[in-house]
Amino acid sequence: MRCRRVVAAFAACILGAASGDLAVSRVATGASSQPILMAAPYEYLGWGNPQPPAGVLAATGIQDLTLAFVLSHGACSPAWDGTRPLTGGPDQAAIESVRAAGGNVAVSFGGSSGNKLGVSCKSASALANAYQKVISAYGLEAIDIDIEHTEFTSAAVRRRVVAALAIVQRSNPGIEISITFATAESGPEHDGQSLIADAAAIGLQPSAWTVMPFDFGAPVSDMAQASISAVEELEHDLLSSYHISADVAYRHIGISSMNGHTDESDETVSIEDFQLMLAFAQQDHLARLTFWSVDRDRPCGGANRSPDACSGTSQQPFAYTDLVAEYHG
């Protein structure tokens, strides 16, 4: 039986567990090590005034970060932002600094702008090789595919991406994979539903299907409830495509929010909204709770006045990151 969640009454709903076809990740197995993707907010080093990654760990309880974005440097060649080399630059230094501080990183491919590898690489095997170059460069244990624009809206490119990820999953046993994509308040729309169905059809089993419940394009009065509603509808899609239980489905779902003011002038994800998302994630043991981005996790002022460098809300530094640090599945 599926219960409808109400933000004000989390404890009223209890889901029963059942076996399913989707492989249960470390989130559900009780392994002692927390998956990297579970609580790893995004940081982007390409603009603004980014917070030093190791400094984020030192200032908060967070252990892991998701560094963004790897794009195409032309043809099918991966590079940070499509321009910076994989090795010998600031991005490799950032990864090394996080690991030296006792943490780890996931690397995110794609994002909202730039040339995407899924489009530039003309076959699934070539795209898998591009992903593998990045995995091998850093010995990665976790990757995120932030699939947007043509990668998301073109059926042929979507299928190429999931086929490439299936190759990566076979070649790297145990690797964590998140597929992150846009959603409506009513849940994934046609492209998102097709993405899930295509992945299930070829046996791809991501650690997390992560929705981005913001930039809805219409006024939303309650961003926490809108986010929860989107997740509940995503659960339906996973049940339909993978034929699994509700419990297993939730353990393979993620929320990637946006802290403070979003790209929409009438949207704000407040600290209180994010606290409710945290409570929901804890209730249903979601695979992932994250946000865009650590760069913005501070009040505006001084050198940090652009929307890329601050949240636009009244907050303490790292207020959203501190909440993610509380999440342990």
Specify the residue positions occupied by each region the protein language model found.
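Conserved active-site loop/cleft motifs that coordinate metal ions or position small ligands
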Residues: G254-S257, R288-S293
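Short, low-complexity, polybasic intrinsically disordered segments
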Residues: S270-A287
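Hydrophobic alpha-helical elements and their junctions with loops/disorder across both membrane
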Residues: L15-S19, G48, R288
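C-terminal "post-core" interaction segments
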Residues: A249, Q282-D284, S293-V294
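Chitinase-like catalytic core of GlcNAc-active glycosidases
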Residues: S32-V211, D215-I244, V248-F274, C300-Y327
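Secretory targeting and sorting signals
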Residues: M1-A28
